[in-house]
């Protein structure tokens, strides 16, 4: 599709030849007009996902033409097309198992960003299919691009009991072997409007008869989805980022207990029981009940294994501060995201009893 478009409309894709973006920063060569471009083309795998759409928006604002590989129906990428000017966002149908379709999606690009990932298995794709085989396939076909960014996950380890963590670690390792000068991003737990973090725990506090508290003293460092996108854009704009590994996380560190207290305040579910439970109990419930009978289970055994550690940046790691990105405090977003899960009677309460 992309090749046909470029033949029929030579000006559709404007590739900047002989650019030096691999070592030098991405330069904004336009001066104010929205319709002017930098001459750069970026392919973003995972652009139709939760965090991908924010990155597409920022790249388009910068004047970069964005190729969006998709495998969904047209409705899945339609909202992305309005994030840029006419012809700036280019959807291309692809199959993650088909090398030819991947090559077609990156054939005109200076920049390739792999944000495609999966934290649960489906009937069509296993964790290894996406996080290992697809990651290495995309990297192998992108060896000649000028800038390659691979998005992994924080605390990924080949020795982890979590299949997700192991698959992410192996995918990252293979990518760095194929493209030694690629930039790796390891984001922490991500929150935002469509997340599976604040929304998930808010639903649990609303629908469950009790709130299970496990991993109570393990620490977390949540990251806002827009900060992840801003960090990736800053990597493109900052010199000397090639071949480096960045760990993206928020500035604030909480224990799971402190986070759940914030969820209870946000949802006003003060009457719910708070029951400390062991990891083994939660894994049993998840594996034998939720994953078997729930269509969209709130808890997955593998994710419980993955979160059974401190989800914080490691000492000495490069972070968003090194890219001059200011992070968003979770308190700024949590109330707005969780208030929809409050009980109806909460909105009938008298704000000031003296003025009945």
UniProtKB/Swiss-Prot annotation:
Belongs to the complex I NDUFA9 subunit family. Accessory subunit of the mitochondrial membrane respiratory chain NADH dehydrogenase (Complex I), that is believed not to be involved in catalysis. Complex I functions in the transfer of electrons from NADH to the respiratory chain. The immediate electron acceptor for the enzyme is believed to be ubiquinone. It comes from Dictyostelium discoideum. GO terms for molecular function: NADH dehydrogenase activity; protein-containing complex binding. It is found in: Mitochondrion matrix. It comes from the Eukaryota. Complex I is composed of about 45 different subunits. This a component of the hydrophobic protein fraction. The gene is ndufa9. The keyword Zinc does not apply. This is NADH dehydrogenase [ubiquinone] 1 alpha subcomplex subunit 9, mitochondrial. Binds 1 FAD per subunit. Coiled coil: none annotated. GO terms for biological process: ubiquinone biosynthetic process. Disulfide bonds: none annotated. InterPro entries: ComplexI_NDUFA9_subunit, NAD(P)-bd_dom_sf, RmlD-like-bd. Transmembrane segments: none annotated. Keywords: Electron transport, FAD, Flavoprotein, Mitochondrion, Respiratory chain, Transit peptide, Transport. Gene3D superfamilies: NAD(P)-binding Rossmann-like Domain (3.40.50.720). Its cofactor is FAD.
